[in-house]
């Protein structure tokens, strides 16, 4: 049952889980010193689904509504706060948003769009690189993995984390290329090669940095993880329909719908301070898959409204027109509303299914596949309702 009146113990519990953002390192250590020390996985909440707060300053409320402003606020939650996920409920969200879902936790309600559903599935790590391989792909299967940095700091995302005194982490659903294993610190660690030695992962914005993370937080991907779904179906019969009004994506084999999910496509809005329109709308029309890559650094410079970004390890990318891709998104849970810079955001689980089902097939060894017209992969019908 939801505890609507918090005891002192409950209050200290929820207050304490928000301390990880600004107090992530011992006070005696500088940010650079903290980056260099090995890090174990923390003890995660004991819950089948664990909600991770994706944004700073999110309210924990006593009721599933923001009506009344802050009248029902219990606590201000920091980014990466972890909460036991009891159930989703239909709430009352004021402010023009279509998503009305809140997540009920033992301590209160959190707006669902800013709470990533994660799981804690630790793995038995391997201690040697697979024979004959230069490395391996690995998927994060815990809420997050704290990272140890090796070498020079170069990437905008890491510099941003340090400027805000926030720990660099990999999050549930991200996929990375590992090229080394060590046990010298008393536990197994994998080294994430952010550039991936030219394997394709580092295209477009990677900075060639190296990070270590505890191996138990990563599932080593196998051929089964990328095996084709419905391999006996004629590839021409596989198509996708993207509904820009309803923010949904459907996969078809002939006329039969075989998969459906909510997505977040490109956003179109007006800047409050200038009245300038910013249009990242995903285009309608017939779009053709021309590039698939297991994981990619996605980076854009400063644009209108100061909306540049640098996001490493974006998983399961299916490019369907220029730089527009269907891919996994771990930084929000606002699926069903426009949100992106033009790409089609899906949950990591949905993006992985689409990646495996769509054409062309991508093996672990290759890591990516490209097509040039007249050749192309799966066709996507992007349209309004």
Each model region followed by its residue ranges:
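Cell wall/extracellular polymer interaction/catalysis modules
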Residues: 181-285
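SH3/SH3-like (including bacterial SH3b) beta-barrel domains
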Residues: 65-79, 159-170
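Exported/periplasmic cell-wall-interacting domains
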Residues: 233-235, 270-271, 280-284, 291, ...
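Solvent-exposed, polar/charged alpha-helical surfaces in well-ordered, non-transmembrane soluble domains
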Residues: 75-78, 247, 349-356
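SH3/SH3-like beta-barrel superfamily modules
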Residues: 76-117, 168-216
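Boundary regions of SH3-family modules and the immediately adjacent low-complexity/disordered segments
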Residues: 33-44, 103-142, 194-234
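N-terminal secretory signal peptides
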Residues: 1-10, 17-20, 25, 32-34
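C-terminal segment of N-terminal export signals and the immediately downstream linker at the start
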Residues: 25-68, 82
């Amino acid at each position: 049952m939801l505890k609507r009146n918090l005891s002192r113990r409950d209050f200290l519990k929820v207050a304490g889980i928000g301390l990880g953002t600004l107090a992530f390192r011992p006070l005696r250590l500088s940010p650079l010193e903290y980056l260099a020390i090995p890090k174990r996985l923390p003890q995660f909440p004991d819950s089948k689904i664990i909600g991770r707060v994706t944004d700073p300053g999110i309210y924990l409320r006593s009721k599933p509504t923001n009506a009344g402003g802050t009248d029902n606020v219990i606590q201000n939650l920091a980014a990466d706060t972890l909460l036991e996920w009891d159930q989703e409920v239909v709430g009352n969200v004021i402010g023009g948003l279509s998503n009305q879902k809140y997540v009920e936790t033992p301590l209160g309600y959190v707006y669902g769009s800013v709470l990533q559903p994660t799981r804690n599935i630790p793995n038995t790590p391997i201690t040697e690189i697979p024979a004959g391989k230069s490395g391996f792909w690995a998927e994060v299967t815990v809420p997050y993995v704290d990272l140890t940095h090796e070498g020079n700091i170069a990437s905008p995302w890491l510099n941003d984390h340090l400027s805000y005194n926030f720990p660099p982490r990999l999050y549930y659903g991200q996929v990375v290329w590992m090229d080394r294993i060590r046990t010298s610190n008393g536990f197994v660690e994998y080294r994430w090669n952010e550039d991936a030695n030219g394997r394709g992962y580092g295209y477009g914005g990677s900075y060639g940095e190296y990070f270590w993370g505890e191996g138990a937080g990563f599932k080593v991907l196998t051929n089964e993880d990328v095996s084709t779904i419905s391999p006996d179906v004629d590839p021409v019969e596989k198509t996708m329909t993207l509904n820009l009004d309803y923010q949904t994506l459907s996969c078809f084999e002939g006329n039969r719908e075989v998969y459906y999910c909510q997505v977040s496509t490109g956003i179109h809005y007006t800047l409050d301070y200038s009245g300038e329109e910013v249009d990242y709308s995903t285009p309608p029309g017939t779009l053709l898959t021309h590039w698939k890559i297991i994981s990619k650094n996605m980076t854009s410079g400063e644009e209108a409204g100061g909306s540049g970004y640098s996001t490493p390890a974006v998983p399961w990318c299916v490019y369907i027109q220029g730089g527009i891709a269907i891919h996994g998104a771990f930084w929000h849970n606002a699926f069903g509303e426009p949100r992106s810079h033009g790409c089609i955001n899906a949950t990591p689980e949905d993006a992985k299914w689409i990646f495996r089902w769509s054409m062309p097939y991508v093996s672990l060894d290759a890591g990516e596949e490209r097509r040039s017209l007249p050749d192309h992969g799966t066709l996507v019908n992007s349209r309004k309702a």
